[in-house]
From Swiss-Prot:
It comes from Arabidopsis thaliana (Mouse-ear cress). It comes from the Eukaryota. Its main location: nucleus. It is found in: Nucleus. The gene is STKL2. Expressed strongly in leaves and flowers, weakly in roots, and very weakly in stems. Residues 1-119 are annotated as: Disordered. It holds the Pfam family GeBP-like_DBD. Disulfide bonds: none annotated. This is Transcription factor STKL2.
Length: 319
């Protein structure tokens, strides 16, 4: 039998290394291990940990508010068309109400700026025509019998006119269509009618209305050269204007023509009214003819007187 081999003996270096390993392992085992700490909610937090928790909570609240805002925006964007149309309609309604209020205010301002006209165009024509008709009917001036003229003429006015309004309107119509009249190419038919009636009433060849003195009025005019103020007297007007009849109207109404023509079937009022509408040029021509007739009448009367003298002389000499 082979002799048993003795186990290999370790070298000194190997023995030293193994001994060091054993020593390290034993020392590591002898050290107490750190206990595993389990976090507890009851443990007190340090100040730094509290600050960190606050910042974390604020971040969480910001995130929550951001999420809520996003949700609201989405909900607003997801609103139904009916809700949107309702809101739009409500906005349009408020806008239309505002526009209506502005329009009403504008109309009120226009009404204040432009007051409603009291005298119509027909009233103005009727008023001027009433002056002519009263003279033709009565043979006297309307201003000599103002109350009677007012009682008759106010019936042709479309509204309940007062005594002051009545005669003030006549004065203003005279100033507009006679005193301050101007030839305008754009005059309306109404203006032309009023102008014709005004000339017939206040013209020198018509009824010839004169304007007596009302009160002493004057105006100051600055001279161009020396810039001195000069006092210029204005023509004065009396409120109660008097109508002075033209000679052409007097001779016609006092002549034999009116009763003779009236005997033919027309009444004197119609004759005088129609005569007042005859043109002034025609009136003058007829008046000249009447002067010739009156002269021949004088000659005829003298001839008749001469014949009468001869007859009376002969009769006186006869036994």
């Amino acid at each position: 039998m082979a002799p048993l081999e003795s186990p290999a003996t370790a070298s000194s270096s190997e023995v030293e290394s193994s001994s060091e390993e054993i020593f390290k392992s034993s020392s590591e085992e002898s050290k107490p291990k750190d206990p595993v700490t389990v976090p507890s909610s009851k443990t007190l937090k340090s100040p730094s940990a509290a600050v960190n928790s606050k910042t974390d909570s604020s971040d969480d609240s910001e995130k929550q508010s951001f999420v809520l805002t996003r949700r609201k925006k989405k909900e607003g964007a997801a609103e139904s068309p009916a809700v949107k149309s309702g809101k739009k309609r409500a906005g349009e309604g408020s806008t239309s109400r505002d526009m209506h209020v502005k329009r009403v205010k504008k109309e009120d301002d226009n009404k204040k700026a432009n007051p409603q006209r009291v005298w119509s165009e027909e009233d103005e024509i009727s008023l001027l025509q009433a002056v002519i008709d009263f003279k033709a009917e009565t043979g006297t001036s309307p201003w000599d019998h103002k109350n009677a003229f007012f009682d008759i003429a106010k019936k042709s006015i479309s509204f309940d006119v007062s005594h002051v309004q009545f005669f003030d309107k006549i004065r203003r119509l005279k100033n507009k269509y006679f005193v301050n009249r101007k030839n305008k190419s754009g005059e309306s038919n109404h203006d032309k009618k009023c102008l014709g009636l005004a000339v017939l009433i206040w013209g020198s060849d018509g009824m010839n209305v004169e304007s007596p003195v009302k009160k002493d009025e004057s105006i100051l005019v600055k001279g161009k050269a020396n810039s001195k103020e000069k006092k210029v007297e204005k023509p004065l007007v009396i409120e109660d204007e008097q109508v002075i009849l033209g000679a052409d109207s007097e001779w016609f109404e006092e002549s034999f023509l009116v009763p003779v023509i009236a005997n033919l079937g027309l009444d004197e009022y119609s004759v005088k009214k129609k005569w007042s509408k005859v043109s002034l040029e025609t009136k003058k021509k007829i008046q000249e003819k009447m002067k010739v007739v009156d002269a021949k009448k004088c000659e005829l009367l003298l001839a008749e007187m001469d014949v009468l003298k001869d007859v009376t002389s002969v009769l006186a000499q006869t036994n």
